[in-house]
Amino acid sequence: MGKLHLYSGRRKRFPEKLSWAAVEGGVELEEAKAFMLSVWNSDEKSTKCIELWTKDMSMDEMKIFFHQTLLSMTETFQRATGDENMSATMQDFCDYFAEKLELRK
């Protein structure tokens, strides 16, 4: 079974440093400015989330991070459900999101 390790130098509201390792995936120890993890609780039918970002992550980086996360979720939804129509709708939203944040110039 693979393991993911997250290291957070969390002080007060924002961690000063984030790093992670996934040895089986070839990542020994890599720094990151943001991290999101969602887990599904089947008994409660609810999602639990951990969202962390460092104090030095810029607003522009956060916008790009969210956009790329939404794109990844869209791809995962398509693979998991095969629902072409909703996947296209989600992709439309990703395009709208990027346009409104002026991410694609």
Label each PLM-derived region with a short phrase:
Residues 9-10:
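Short, acidic, Ser/Thr-enriched surface-loop or helix-capping motifs
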Residues 17-80:
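Active-site- and interface-proximal helix/loop "cap" or "latch" segments in soluble metabolic
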